[in-house]
């Protein structure tokens, strides 16, 4: 199968693929793997949800004191990976991470369900806990604390924008003769290269 659609700008191509994924994936086409690395070079990955994207980059939100938050603080680079099984496609993105503005983070936090807002305060993300009741008690405590009031965004919870420097588009084809297109940012322009599968 040949992919006919070509783009000079990889963000345009991502947008086209993502819109197709939203129609064909049964749930969460915005799910992506985020891979980071610790100060001593230990890699780690986890699934998160992309909350926005544009020409400036790809945005997700997290507890900045979590493992990924501390790794990003020490090494502000990451790799994202989208895989859409229904389309037999994946997109791999590499780049540098930058914090979103407080205003942008506040707007998104305000849009979250109240339970998720409480959860952001209640969970000491990535830290050990004795048992599940510790989390339940923390949720109950913060539910009571914020009863009848607007919940503000925690200072340790915000968004990160990955500014892409490379994107690889992978399309499954017969006999493992897959199509691989890599876009790399050179100066202010994108250069596209085809790779052997």
Residue spans of the language-model regions?
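Binding-site signature for planar aromatic cofactors or substrates
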Residues: 1-197
């Amino acid at each position: 199968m040949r992919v006919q659609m070509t783009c000079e700008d990889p963000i345009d191509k991502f947008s086209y693929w993502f819109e197709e994924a939203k129609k064909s994936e049964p749930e969460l086409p915005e799910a992506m793997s985020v891979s980071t690395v610790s100060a001593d070079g230990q890699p780690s990955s986890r699934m998160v949800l992309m909350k926005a994207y544009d020409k400036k980059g790809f945005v997700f939100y997290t507890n900045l004191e979590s493992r990924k938050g501390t790794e990003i603080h020490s090494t502000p680079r990451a790799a994202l990976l989208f895989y859409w099984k229904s389309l037999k496609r994946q997109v791999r993105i590499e780049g540098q991470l930058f914090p979103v503005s407080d205003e942008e983070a506040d707007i998104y936090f305000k849009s979250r369900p109240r339970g998720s807002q409480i959860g952001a305060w209640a969970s000491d993300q990535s830290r050990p806990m004795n048992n599940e009741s510790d989390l339940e008690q923390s949720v109950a405590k913060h539910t009571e604390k914020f009863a009848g009031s607007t919940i503000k965004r925690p200072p340790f919870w915000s968004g990160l924008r990955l500014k892409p420097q490379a994107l690889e588009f992978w399309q499954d084809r017969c006999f493992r003769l897959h199509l691989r297109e890599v876009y790399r940012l050179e100066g202010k322009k994108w250069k596209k290269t085809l790779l052997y599968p």
